[in-house]
């Protein structure tokens, strides 16, 4: 669990250096978001989006660029980011990206209005871009999952085979985000209660249940970790050959390699989708799935979590049956 905290502390130091080069209002905005427990990734994205907007604004007083902003300024900016030039070609910017940038500005101007930097909020006269949703979900079927594990067994190098198998199994068997998986420390794994304590998106601390097959895979990897990598009894659970914490990029590379034979693009997040879809296909209710995945969208999940403990165990067992 502390792995994520270590990473966030390093990132915050980098952000502090960046903020020192920006107008003071950015530091105030960052502190305002931090007090409201926004995730570091969210705060970083919001700052970057507002900096981009600041550069768009045509004003000599760059430190107080926000004071001359009107709803027309916002509309012109949103129009300007519909397209961009990449390698000499004009490409369309996705609705979701434009909506994210609008949300960043909306939060920024809400902050400005609350703190009396501005008299009126121009965002109130603008509209969030509509996002055209594609309801097609890419995920792996049980047969495809089996083929991926076979590929790891047949092709992975001996010293990383059990590590890679365990990472894929953990993504499929728990639905954890890859950022949470790489930040797990050995001491976060509780073999008595079969749980892993993680810090997830939005700084949520959760105890994730795992079943017997995954338990055995973790134990096998921990032996290899000690034998092949001279791993310490504490610290990062998943390490590279250089003994450092495995990165998100490294896991993305592993997933890409072991799923290359499938006729679909599988990313680490698709392991999460696969976990959800296979639970759904086995008849697990939506509240239980939302609770296991840590989704905020199902607002009643928190209320019913304790009542679904047994269902969550059954759901975990369903996912565990995919790991052979």
Q: Each predicted region: which residue ranges?
A:
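Conserved catalytic core of the tyrosine transesterase superfamily
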Residues: 1-324
């Amino acid at each position: 669990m502390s792995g994520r905290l270590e990473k966030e502390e390093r990132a915050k130091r980098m952000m502090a250096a960046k903020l020192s080069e920006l107008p003071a209002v950015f530091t105030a905005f960052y502190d305002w978001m931090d007090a409201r427990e926004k995730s570091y990734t969210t705060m970083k994205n919001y700052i970057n989006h507002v900096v981009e907007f600041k550069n768009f604004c045509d004003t000599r007083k760059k430190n107080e660029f926000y004071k001359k902003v009107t709803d027309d300024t916002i509309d012109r900016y949103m129009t300007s980011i519909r397209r961009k030039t990449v390698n000499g070609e004009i490409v369309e910017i996705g609705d979701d990206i434009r909506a994210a940038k609008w949300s960043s500005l909306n939060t920024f101007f809400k902050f400005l209005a609350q703190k009396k930097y501005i008299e009126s909020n121009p965002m109130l006269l603008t509209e969030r871009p509509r996002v055209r949703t594609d309801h097609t979900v890419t995920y792996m079927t049980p047969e495809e999952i089996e083929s991926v594990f076979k590929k790891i067994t047949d092709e992975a190098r001996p010293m990383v085979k059990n590590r890679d198998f365990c990472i894929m199994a953990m993504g499929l068997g728990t639905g954890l985000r890859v950022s949470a998986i790489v930040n797990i420390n050995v001491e976060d794994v509780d073999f008595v209660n079969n749980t892993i304590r993680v810090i997830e998106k939005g700084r949520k601390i959760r105890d994730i249940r795992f079943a017997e097959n995954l338990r055995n895979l973790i134990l096998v990897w921990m032996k290899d970790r000690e034998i092949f990598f001279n791993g310490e009894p504490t610290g990062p659970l998943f390490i590279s050959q250089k003994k450092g914490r495995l990165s998100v990029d490294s896991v993305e590379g592993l997933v890409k390699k072991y799923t290359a034979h499938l006729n679909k693009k599988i990313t680490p997040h698709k392991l999460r989708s696969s976990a959800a879809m296979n639970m759904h296909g086995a008849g697990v209710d939506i509240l239980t799935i939302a609770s296991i995945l840590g989704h905020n969208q199902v607002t009643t999940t928190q209320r019913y979590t304790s009542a679904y403990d047994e269902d969550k165990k059954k759901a975990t067992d369903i996912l565990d049956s995919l790991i052979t």
